[in-house]
Amino acid sequence: MAAQLLEEDVVTCSICLGRYRDPVTLPCGHSFCGNCIQDSWRSCEKSCPECRQPFPEGAKLSRNVKMSTLLQALPVLPAPPAVTPRRDSATSHSARCLRHGRPLEFFCRTEGLCVCSACTVHDCSHHERALLDVERRVREDQLRARVLVTQQQVAQAETQLQELQEQRSRIESSACTLASVVSRRFSSLLQALEKQQASTLSDIEVAKKQALGQVLNEKQRLTDHLRALSQYDQSVQDLLAQADDCIFFQELQQLPEPTESLGPLTSPQWNEEQQLSNVNQLLSPLCELLLEEKSLPKVAAKAADAGPLETLGPLAPVPSAVCPLRKKLWQNYRNLTFDPETANQYLHLSHKDQRVTHHFQAQGPAKSGSFELWQVQCTQSFQTGQHYWEVRVSDHSVTLGVTYPKLSRQKLGTHTDNIGRGPCSWGLCIQEDSMQAWHNGKSQRLRGLPGQLLGVDLNLTSGCLTFYSLEPRTQPLHTFYAVFSQPLFPVFWLLEGRTLTLCHQPEATLPARPQEEATAPS
């Protein structure tokens, strides 16, 4: 048996680990299969796989005649039975190095390959090496550690996934509850608002019926008085037509006394301004809360009596590019002109009635419809829809506003202008160091100072009048909320030496006169 194993070792190629096929011998004396050595040299330098001795350049492989004869004399071995690979050191060490034909006993950590003892001497002498079974245990420990970390990550991910599911359930439940609460709250507010609307309309209807009842009573009284006068007149005419003197005197004594004069009529108790005041007191806070643009910076103060304000000054400079808000306002731009019949005698109109200048000397006698104060009104007026216009002022000490047609032309009290001093006008008064919003004789002091380019947005649909400062950026200054019941005219006041210009846009148009424009008052 030992002899047979020895013979097999002698006739075995160290490259393919099988019996020699067409054995050849190298100059160093080692033998290999002819095809095996040729294949080995295609992938590496020409040297002996056993001893690494270089193969001389130009030399030829010599056929090993004795080995060929010996192979022919040996019996053919049966094919080895198929075995199941085992992960033990003996099986691992049965593999051989392709370069040296020796068993693979080491692991080169530098190259990441299994090597033989010859490789450790010739090729991996300076590399980090370890025995296969030792390296195997190290790598298995590393894999087990990785598996442990992975399992921990899996457990953590599953826990986090469960938490996310719980958070999702809580969010859905909370959102559903919140939506239900908000829906109920808004429903109650809508019901309260509808109830208040019905109550307000009912009050207006009651006041209307009372006023109409008074009118009907006065009408009936006048009708009865006219009938009595007519009857007396007819009796007198019949008496005058009587030819018989005795009958004349007899009927004259029976003629009743003439009906006494009724005197002045009783005016019906109907005050439109009072009704509007009551409605505005109710709706203005709601409109300010619900209709105001929350995304825009708010400059106006809430109340005039809030105590001393911070130091006032011009707005911080920023780029003057046209912002989306101003472009949106331009969709309702209106080109306005001043009405010369309303201009104070110290105000001079020019540039096709688009510019007004306050001179120190009168420009002529006062007209019948002109303001006694330094004011001028526009020709155009608006009753429905949304409208926007822009004004450039030479300096502060001006007032911008809108008014009903019946704004008084005379001076009222000690004020320099009457814009916003009564219930029929609304105004923004811009002084050198302050700014106030005026309506019905009440003012709100506002923070900051605007630039010289101003905008006015009149939304009659929603009942909003908003003033804007356009330089150095577009921002709202103040918004009035009211129920406008009559046509509104733009109106202005300016101090001596000031100039005010109505800016025109070439593409701007005015609405149709029957729907949205009223004629100027005489």
UniProtKB/Swiss-Prot annotation:
- Zn finger (B box-type) start-end: 92-134
**Matches recorded under InterPro entries:** B30.2/SPRY, B30.2/SPRY_sf, Butyrophylin_SPRY, ConA-like_dom_sf, E3_ubiq-ligase_TRIM/RNF, PRY, SPRY_dom, TRIM65_SPRY_PRY
Q: Which organism is it from?
A: Mus musculus
What family does the entry list? Belongs to the TRIM/RBCC family.
Where Phosphoserine occurs, residue numbers? S187
Tell me the name of the encoding gene. Trim65
Q: Which PANTHER family match?
A: B-BOX DOMAIN CONTAINING (PTHR25465), E3 UBIQUITIN-PROTEIN LIGASE TRIM65 (PTHR25465:SF14)
What is this protein for, i.e. what is its function?
Answer: E3 ubiquitin ligase that plays a role in several processes including innate immnity, autophagy or inflammation. Negatively regulates miRNAs by modulating the ubiquitination and stability of TNRC6A, a protein involved in RNA-mediated gene silencing by both micro-RNAs (miRNAs) and short interfering RNAs. This ubiquitination results in the suppressed expression of miR-138-5p leading to increased autophagy. Upon enteroviral infection, promotes 'Lys-63'-mediated ubiquitination activation of IFIH1/MDA5 leading to innate signaling cascade.
Any idea what this protein is called? E3 ubiquitin-protein ligase TRIM65
Task: Extract one GO BP annotation from the record.
Answer: positive regulation of interferon-alpha production
